[in-house]
């Protein structure tokens, strides 16, 4: 009886520890990044993506993204401890030590590099490693504590997944892949600044120079509106370039107009609740936009003239 209880207790501790390590990888953010990478894989070929590339490539990108987020948690552990939104993270509470986090990140990164080398190609491996450095070092260490434009300048690393997926299949990164990167790059500021606005009290504690803290609410709202317009323009590039048809065009315009409606309402009559709804919609927006792009890829509709 004692042995069984001890065994159950050990299993419970292991499960808790596994959840804590998983939390370091920011699973929700990683899922969206890998989803966009997988869409990039399918858009790179008119047929089916080879299963080995699909599974091995996606896993490799997932692991390297998780490694980058773990380093982010490590670097920002003291900042996270000050913020209500992030104080629970195991790096902030000290439940997982600095050494353990470094080892965990190294294992994830090494495994991800190996998977991409074996199941994708070296171009994808090195591009993903460069993305890891861009997020973990350039954004987290250099840009985020230095400038309120951190999310704009550092947004390239977060926008890379479609190009990584594309290169995993084709071994190249053509203009079409960069259109997808540009969409996410222009989507990132209004997405993140909506969060920063309704969490501005938290960010004020952190000491980080976030735009709502350094330039105020009104300035940030204007930038959300302007970047939303730029983002909508960027989403039209796949249609203009001929890589998508009318199914995507209609969806891109419809989804974009809803996003613009949120941005305009925020600018006219701000509330934390509306900013939170805008942030949540932005995640749904990107997911639906890329999903429709995939549907359009296989069922492209272009009316005959």
Curated annotation (Swiss-Prot):
It is found in: Cell inner membrane. It catalyses: heme b + (2E,6E)-farnesyl diphosphate + H2O = Fe(II)-heme o + diphosphate. It is a multi-pass membrane protein. The keyword Cell inner membrane applies. Keywords: Cell inner membrane, Cell membrane, Heme biosynthesis, Membrane, Transferase, Transmembrane, Transmembrane helix. One of its GO terms (molecular function) is protoheme IX farnesyltransferase activity. GO terms for biological process: heme O biosynthetic process. The chain crosses the membrane at residues 29-49, 51-71, 101-121, 123-143, 151-171, 177-197, 221-241, 244-264, 283-303. GO terms for cellular component: plasma membrane. Its EC number is 2.5.1.141. Gene3D superfamilies: UbiA prenyltransferase (1.10.357.140). It is an enzyme of class 2 (transferase). Pfam families: UbiA (PF01040). Converts heme B (protoheme IX) to heme O by substitution of the vinyl group on carbon 2 of heme B porphyrin ring with a hydroxyethyl farnesyl side group. Carbon 2 of the heme B porphyrin ring is defined according to the Fischer nomenclature. PANTHER family: 4-HYDROXYBENZOATE SOLANESYLTRANSFERASE, PROTOHEME IX FARNESYLTRANSFERASE, MITOCHONDRIAL. Belongs to the UbiA prenyltransferase family. Protoheme IX farnesyltransferase subfamily. This is Protoheme IX farnesyltransferase.
């Amino acid at each position: 009886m004692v042995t069984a209880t001890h065994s159950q207790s050990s299993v419970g501790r292991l499960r808790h520890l596994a959840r804590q390590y998983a939390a370091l990888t920011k699973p929700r953010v990683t899922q969206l990044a890998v989803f966009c990478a997988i869409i990039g894989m399918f858009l790179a070929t008119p047929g089916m993506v080879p299963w080995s590339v699909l599974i091995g490539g996606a896993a490799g990108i997932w692991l390297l993204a998780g490694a980058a987020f773990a380093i982010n948690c490590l670097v920002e552990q003291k900042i996270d401890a000050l913020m209500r939104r992030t104080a629970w993270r195991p790096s902030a509470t000290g439940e997982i030590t600095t050494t353990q986090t470094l080892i965990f990140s190294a294992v994830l990164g090494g495994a991800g590099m190996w998977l991409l080398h074996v199941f994708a190609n070296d171009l994808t491996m090195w591009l993903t490693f460069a993305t890891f450095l861009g997020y973990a070092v350039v954004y987290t260490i250099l840009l985020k504590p230095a400038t309120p434009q951190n999310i704009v300048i550092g947004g390239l690393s977060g926008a890379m997944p479609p190009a990584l997926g594309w290169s995993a299949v084709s071994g190249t990164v053509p203009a079409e892949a960069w259109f997808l990167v540009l969409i996410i790059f222009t989507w990132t500021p209004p997405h993140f600044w909506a969060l920063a606005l309704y969490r501005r009290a938290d960010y004020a504690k952190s000491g980080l120079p976030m735009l709502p803290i350094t330039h105020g609410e009104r300035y940030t709202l204007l930038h959300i509106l302007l970047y939303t317009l730029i983002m909508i323009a960027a989403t039209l590039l796949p249609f203009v370039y001929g890589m998508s048809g009318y199914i995507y065009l209609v969806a891109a315009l419809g989804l974009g107009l809803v996003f613009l409606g949120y941005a305009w309402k925020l600018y006219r009559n701000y509330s934390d609740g509306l900013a939170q709804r805008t942030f949540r919609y932005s995640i749904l927006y990107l997911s639906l936009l890329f999903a429709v792009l995939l549907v359009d890829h296989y069922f492209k509709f272009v009316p005959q003239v």
